[in-house]
Every structure is written in C-alpha cells, then in structure tokens.
Amino acid sequence: MQKKPMAPQQPTRVRTPREENNEILGIIEQMLGASRVRVRCMDGHTRMGRIPGKLKRKIWVREGDIVIVVPWEVQSDQKCDIIWRYTKGQVSWLSKKGYLKQAYD
C-alpha cells in the first residue's frame, strides 16, 4: 500500500507586521554569532538584530529567512529585535499579496 502524496499546505492565517507596534519585515543577510544577525529591513536600513531567548529555543533562524523585526527605541536605525520568522508557505503568501515588494528579489 502506497502513501498518498501530501498536498502543499496553504497557510490558514499569516501574521503580518503591525504598524501600530512599529513592526517591519526584514531579510536576514548574515549570521553574526551570539544570537545576533544582520537584517536588511523593508524601510531601507540594515540593522543588527537580536534573537530573543524565547524565539531562539523554539525555531532556528537562517540566512535568507523573512522575519518581522521591531527597531529599538534607542538607536532605531541600527538595532532591532526579531519577533517572528516565516515559513516557506507563508513567504509565498506574502509575496502574492504584495507585502515583500522589491526587497525580496
């Protein structure tokens, strides 16, 4: 008896960045070590991102991943916290809906 091929899963609900919470989409460019990454944000800035412990324990973040970041109140053009990482299915949904624009090319 053969297994049926699984259909690709469509995301039922995708978390989008909330402007009232100052959230921005970003792409991880480089892993720096010690829970730090370099993130190219959709607002044009390249920031050093910090991966908080609660996120670091649950998921792995790699170069090229699409994430939601929150800039710090101090040094907002240079530093940020990563609060969410998208899966491949969610990234395709975001690109179809126009959230990623030209920065994901």
From Swiss-Prot:
Disulphide bridges: none
Lineage, top ranks: Archaea, Methanobacteriati, Methanobacteriota, Methanomada group, Methanococci
GO MF, one annotated term: translation initiation factor activity
Tagged with keyword Protein biosynthesis: yes
Domain of life of the source: Archaea
Family named by the database record: Belongs to the eIF-1A family.
InterPro entries found in the cross-reference section: NA-bd_OB-fold (IPR012340), RNA-binding_domain_S1_IF1 (IPR006196), TIF_eIF-1A (IPR001253), TIF_eIF-1A_CS (IPR018104)
Purpose: Seems to be required for maximal rate of protein biosynthesis. Enhances ribosome dissociation into subunits and stabilizes the binding of the initiator Met-tRNA(I) to 40 S ribosomal subunits.
Record-annotated S1-like domain positions: 12-87
Keywords of this entry: Initiation factor, Protein biosynthesis
Signal peptide stretch: none
Classification via NCBIfam families: eIF-1A, PRK04012.1-3, PRK04012.1-5
Protein's name according to its UniProt entry: Translation initiation factor 1A
Organism: Methanococcus aeolicus (strain ATCC BAA-1280 / DSM 17508 / OCM 812 / Nankai-3)
